[in-house]
């Protein structure tokens, strides 16, 4: 009976951690969409707020300021495709996601987004580290 209770407890615990790890991909996509919306509004300050480590780094801050304001477009922003930085982070990981978005009927914008994912035991957090200038539509991210 004790073994059965332990097995059930273990299964529930692992299931909870897996659910947290899988939901981080959705959180990453939502934050990437927030960046795209800020860029479409031409709100460079919002892009830097969404990437706080970039905002504190002089080179990253300058690079972001150089392109983020040029992406202003009218219309509702939609994600055409998002490839997450990591499918399921079981430890702290830094990776690069690929975001394709457009506003209204405009042409697609494709960007790479550097992401820090925390392991599920420490909360499974997602932090955007930096966003790249637009890349070619068929280009991959490093």
What are these regions (language model features)?
Residues 45-105:
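Short solvent-exposed beta->alpha transition segments
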Residues 21, 60-64, 113, 128-131:
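Generic hydrophobic, helix-prone segments enriched in Leu/Val/Ile
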Residues 2-6, 52-56, 139-141:
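Short low-complexity stretches enriched in small and charged residues
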Residues 21, 28, 72, 104-106, ...:
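Extended interaction regions within the primary functional domain
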Residues 31, 53-56, 133-136:
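Context-gated lysine
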Residues 88-142:
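Exposed beta-sheet edge and beta->alpha loop/turn motif
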Residues 1-37, 41, 49:
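Short, low-complexity N-terminal intrinsically disordered segments enriched in polar/charged residues
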């Amino acid at each position: 009976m004790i073994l059965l209770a332990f097995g059930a407890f273990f299964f529930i615990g692992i299931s909870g951690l897996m659910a947290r790890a899988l939901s981080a991909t959705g959180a990453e996509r939502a934050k990437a969409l927030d960046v795209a919306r800020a860029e479409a509004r031409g709100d460079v300050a919002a892009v830097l707020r969404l990437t706080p480590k970039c905002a504190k780094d002089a080179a990253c801050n300058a690079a972001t300021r150089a392109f983020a304001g040029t992406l202003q477009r009218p219309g509702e922003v939609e994600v055409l495709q998002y490839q997450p930085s990591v499918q399921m982070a079981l430890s702290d990981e830094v990776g690069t996601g690929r975001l394709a978005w457009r506003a209204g009927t405009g042409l697609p914008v494709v960007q790479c987004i550097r992401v820090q994912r925390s392991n599920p035991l420490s909360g499974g957090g997602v932090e955007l580290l930096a966003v790249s200038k637009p890349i070619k539509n068929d280009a991959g991210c490093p």
